[in-house]
Design a protein with these regions (language model features):
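Flexible, gly/ser-rich surface segments that form the specificity/activation loops bordering the active-site cleft
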Residues: 1-29, 35-41, 56-67, 84
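C-terminal cap/linker of serine protease catalytic domains
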Residues: 55-119
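Residue-level recognition of tetratricopeptide repeat
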Residues: 134, 168, 212-213, 246, ...
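Register position in tetratricopeptide repeats
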Residues: 147, 181-185, 225, 259-260, ...
Length: 435
């Protein structure tokens, strides 16, 4: 019998099973010869004992009715990845938050990548309602509000975390993290409730409740931001002698020592330790440490080791570092008299840099070409620079000197006179010399 519920009345219609099939080895699928199109999908079929044996599925034909085993319905479930499905994204309806908190967090993360901010806010609220003792929901809400400038709202969220969360240490730690991100990265100066001292207090409270080294590390980072470098270094140094001694700790210790005026020889020891804790082949995690050590070797005029680190960094970055890096490596290569690779790097810097920096890099490239007697190339590069900045006196001067070398004195003097007209006194010496 098909049981229909219509107009608040129960109606039953008798059906005869034409045949039944099995699917997934254990579920029944029934086909009935009769179909009057009156049943509502999902309506139950019951047997003589009143047991539900199937749920109605209307057929696309007019001659059959189908029913699926009700046990199969209990296996149907959604997962966090379903929020990315286009059919769900076309509606304003939110899905139910999964019972597993990790899956629920994944759902929120995936929702944050969509453009529906209302759904995202709703899912965060749903998560907090379902897992009020978990810190993650409050933190996610606070970070969203903070990024939108609602610092008071973010503060209120984290106070709720302190009140309701089971893990009080984690709540204090996340509170300082939310504050710290605003204090370090936001230009806002109106909201005065959050300070580095308050963030430090939260980190220390987290450590007091649960003495995890990560919380101690957080305190050291805040002290560094407060410019209390000696206190910060003391903690970093202590951490470097524990199981928490990772690359970041040694790198931060080196930064503290640099601010305290330590010698380069002391700093390179710490940076060596930072790089030594990176696994090979290097990944992006190692990038800042390898670059910092290369720059330190460069400052110590150990150009060979500096260049080795610069090359490793370029490999880590898949040749897509910024213009500043290629200019830095260019100068190192010039110091090693590796002029051809230096020219390659300065050309690449000019290619990837911001438009306003391009004339500067092109003038530098022309200067090296002049230095190594690539006179025709120096003129061409200087002309490229002058197309972007017609009054660039460096490019005009380099072009003039290159033209002198090419025995094109009238054109050379024209460039040098132009330099003088623009007020650059360097031209006087060369005008007198080549007049």
């Amino acid at each position: 019998w098909l049981v229909n519920f219509a107009d608040k009345k129960v109606k039953t219609d008798e059906y005869s099973v034409e045949r039944s099939e099995k699917f997934m080895d254990k579920y029944a699928y029934y086909i009935f010869a009769y179909n009057d199109k009156s049943g509502v999908a999902g309506s139950p079929f019951v047997n003589a004992n009143g047991q539900v044996i199937g749920l109605l599925q209307q057929s696309e034909t007019n001659i059959e009715t189908h029913a699926v085993d009700p046990r199969f319905a209990t296996t149907l479930a959604f997962n966090s990845l379903d929020v990315t499905r286009p059919d769900y994204n076309k509606t304003a309806i939110r899905m139910q938050v999964p019972d597993d908190s990790k899956q629920a967090l994944l759902m929120i993360m995936l929702t944050s990548e969509r453009q529906d901010s209302a759904k995202y806010v709703g899912y965060i609220a749903d998560y907090i309602a379902k897992f009020p003792q978990q810190v993650d929901g409050y933190t996610t809400s606070a970070l969203r509000k903070s990024s939108n400038g609602d610092f008071a709202g973010a503060d209120a969220d984290m106070k709720q975390a302190l009140k309701h969360a089971t893990n009080k240490a984690e709540a204090h730690a996340e509170y300082w993290r939310v504050m710290y991100q605003k204090l370090i990265y936001s230009n806002d100066s109106l909201y005065k409730e959050w300070t580095l001292d308050k963030a430090l207090g939260e980190a220390e409270e987290a450590y007091k409740i649960d003495p995890q080294l990560a919380y101690r590390h957080s305190a050291a980072q805040i002290l560094f931001s407060k410019r209390e470098y000696d206190k910060a270094y003391e903690i970093f140094d202590q951490l470097s002698k524990t199981s928490f001694a990772n690359s970041e700790v040694f790198y931060e210790a080196a930064q503290c020592k640099a601010q305290l005026g330590a010698k380069n020889e002391e700093l390179i020891v710490l940076l060596d330790s930072a790089v030594a804790r990176c696994t090979k082949p290097y990944t992006s995690v190692a990038a800042p440490y390898v670059l910092a050590r290369g720059q330190m070797y460069d400052a110590m005029k150990d150009y060979r080791r500096a260049l080795a680190d610069y090359n490793d960094y370029d490999t880590i970055m898949y040749g897509r570092a910024n213009a500043d890096f290629y200019f830095t490596r260019y100068k190192c290569e010039v110091n090693m008299r590796q002029y051809q690779v230096a020219l390659n790097d300065i050309a690449h810097a000019a290619y990837v840099c911001e438009p306003q920096m391009r004339p500067i890099y092109l003038a530098e490239m022309a200067s090296l070409q002049l230095r190594v007697n690539m006179l025709d190339n120096a003129v061409k590069t200087a002309d490229l620079c002058l197309q972007l900045d017609a009054d660039n006196t460096d490019a005009l001067l380099i072009k003039g000197l290159a033209l002198v070398g090419l025995k094109k004195k009238p054109e050379a003097m024209e460039c040098l006179q132009r330099v003088k007209t623009l007020g650059d006194q360097r031209a006087d010496e060369y005008i007198k010399k080549y007049k």
